Amino acid sequence: DKLDTDQWIQAAKAAGAKFAILTATHETGFGLWQSDVNPYCLKAVKWRDGKGDIVRDFVNSCRKYGLQPGIYIGIRWNSLLGIHNFKAEGEGEFARNRQAWYKRLCEKMVTELCTRYGDLFMIWFDGGADDPQGLGPNVEPIVNQYQPDCLFYHNVNRADLRWGGSESGSVGYPCWSSFPYPYSHSNATDGITDHNQLLAHGDPEGKFWVPAMADTPLRGYNGRHEWFWEPGDDDKAVYPLENLMEMYEKSVGRNATLMVGLTPNPEGLIPDGDVHRLQEWGNEIQRRFGTPLAQTSGKNKKKLAITFDKPQRVNYYQIQEDITEGE
């Protein structure tokens, strides 16, 4: 039993992460917690005598090392139960009953995850939670009730943030936090040919605050794109430092939040090569941006000046605005 969520979070923190999100259940339907409603969970395995709770371990590790915990819930697919793109297999009354049952199951699982682990930073529904008036469960009221300060991502009615349109770790330039809709994906956006451009750039005239995030797996180099561990993986799949810095500048540097996927190996640990690269990355971010030569601020000014005591070589300018009241 080498699984160590402390090691996961320490690796993320070394890169400069401020929050971490755990995939609590994905497309198989298997849950990484002690579920009372989903028997396909850690209760069903011999590991830790069937009493393990990786969600709890993860949340505890986040709080121990000062990262905000979030939970990722995959309900769009469930291979065990025959759910494909939210839809239960089959036709007729039997399929309709299974659909209704699956929606209630999802709501109960979300209730468990929202009520057992204290305050959460984000609830992330992979592929969304769809339309509660259609195939999707009605999860938004559950999150609102039990996690009122939590970021919600997402269903057809609401997205507190938006995907940046690719899994490249970058967004477009410019990238506005404002958006024309309070959601990022819905039936109204299906088939819109330039929707990915809208996701990548936002809309300066948008009425809704839906900031962008850029995501990518750390093991996305050399022809790979691995969100999960793959047999035969090696350090050649890990992005080089220069690629990661380019992503940082084209995501964080363009007004987006960068989210990087880490995958434990079969022993339950982040591989040594990944840990080393994350530490290198955090060090390089600090080297470039951690100690500015000078800084200034101003309000309602068209020009700002910075004066040095002696000539200085400057290779970066970092410009930010106060976004507490919008852009």
Q: Where are the regions a protein language model picked out?
A:
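Mature catalytic domains of secreted/periplasmic carbohydrate-active enzymes
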Residues: D1-E327
